[in-house]
Amino acid sequence: MFLIALSLPLYAVHSVNQPLNMWDLVATVVCLCGIVIAYFADTQLYEFVSRNNKLKGLGKPVVSVLDSGLWYYCRHPNYFGEQLWWWGLVVFAWSLGLGWTFIGALVNTMCLAYVTRLVEDRMLKQESRAEAFRVYQKTTSVWVPWFKSSPSGVKNKNA
């Protein structure tokens, strides 16, 4: 039922016969960016997990935190890409006067916010990763890709 409700914006957009406008172009760009970001983030995560599984199988230490590629700029770029997709669909529907479609994207955003918290709590419970992940949390944006910040309490090496 939840997935059907989330898909209602697609139905709404395709049920109206209107010519394309500027907002459709904006929505298309947002949706495509979301798909590309989610794809590359998920691919990078898969490669990270696979590499760590190989290292673990060889008895070597694993890398505690994925902080390269898109993961350098935010802690959950895959979720960011997914959010771009859903909010892009809202832009499509909104331009057709179907503003109610934002409800699905909003519910999805709230669910991912909750899942984000669960994932991060799980990372902090793993002793081998907790310290590195705390630094990663302090220096890296949660969802929206942004520049790194310096962790508080860590002195600059050049000072």
Annotate each PLM feature:
Residues 1-5:
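Specific transmembrane helices
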